Amino acid sequence: MTRPNNSTLKNVAFYAACFTFSVALFVALAAAGHVYPFGDNSFLTNDLKYQYIDFFAWFRRVLLGEANLRYSFSQGLGMNTWGLYSYYLASPFNLLCALFPADKLTLFIFAITALKLGCIHISSAWYVQKRFDLSKPAAFLLSLSFTFCSWTISNLRNPLWIDCLILLPICAYGCHELIRKRRMIRLVIATALNVMFCWYTAYISILFLCIFVLIEFVDYVAEKGFSWKLMLDRALRFAGAIALGLLLSAWTFLPTILAMSKGGPVLALGPLLKTSLKSVIRGFLPCMWVSNESTPQFYCGIIMMLLAVSLLVNRTVSIKTRIATLVVTIILVASSVLSPLEHIWCGMRVPNGFYSRTAFLLSFFALWAAGYTLQILKDQPKLRQAYRPAVILPLLALTAIELFANAHVVWNQLYAGYSENTNRAYVATATNTIATTT
């Protein structure tokens, strides 16, 4: 039997530290905001209270053998529930609800949210280390900024969307491998899992990957040279990888789309602009998000955003890569400002609530750009001193404090005033209703 080498143990310890730190920061946020289970402010708000808790109560009964996954009278007059399952409940984290009593479903939601944040930190740290060969402190800082970006913190009310942030870094590295090494398998598997866990956010992710893979291609040809044969080969491989991923997951998303295609608001004429310039600017700043003013959730840590912006003016980077980076950034910002672009990202439908659903893509792109910048700093003797742990660790501490403060401000708007005692009664009613109608 071979023993794990020292490098393996260090990696395990690093990823364990990423997971533990994010979970601890999440728990500290709940304690500071007096959010359940550390206070009377309920963790159930908006859709979590009025939709998800009913679904989780039903799904728990399914897992315990007390209800049928395919059919439920609790849906009204009785209907097939496969569409409900594949859209709301397909995340593997939801299997844990069977371990919680019916009256502790709020605690279950809190627990899986903590687990998901820890997994986002792990996957994004793995990505920047693999893609840019960054040191562990640098990878920790950037991945923490992505994990606790404003979009994530303000959208914990939609737990089905969060799984996408775990898989997006893996998909992105799959694009890198496809362009550089012609390998497709990672992108195929990650795409299939993304669709199976939540096809709605997977659709958004796949559209983004169609743009992101072009960035990786431009960066590659800036280094190796362009040819039409190369472009055709990589385009066919990318299309094939996405198609295979969709084929592997078709058993879950095709019935769902057919079940849900009969309803929902379709495209309609409306204002061209979704928000104001003032709100866009506020969206990039810490502690400035306002829930009722259509503020896009662009903020993802000042250090990471500054590193990302510095890529655009770094002359050691190919002008083609810098121009492509600027174009993609403009597209992602415009997607939260212009209604036609928002409709494209949302499946040609008018989204109902939860403004700026694609802002997490800009945060991830900032992660990529910041990682690219640090990779360059690491390779330049004159700038290498700024890359030392003695410099990065204090910046990491400041980033953690800054992200915590921003999240605290956001949570005070989202969770204050929602009494856990009131919501506990609602959960009990929902559980009893589900039990008597399934």
Outline where the language-model segments fall.
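Start-transfer (signal-anchor) and selected internal transmembrane alpha helices
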Residues: 1-34, 233-237
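Membrane-embedded alpha-helical segments of integral membrane proteins
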Residues: 194-196, 357-365, 378, 385-438
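Hydrophobic core of alpha-helical transmembrane segments in multi-pass integral membrane proteins
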Residues: 18-30, 305-309, 330-334, 394-407, ...
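Membrane-embedded alpha-helical segments of multi-pass membrane proteins
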Residues: 111-119, 162-170, 206, 299-304, ...
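Periplasmic/ER-lumenal interhelical loops and adjacent helix-loop junctions
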Residues: 46-59, 78, 92, 230, ...
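Membrane-interface coil-to-helix junctions
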Residues: 24-124, 144-166, 204, 260-265, ...
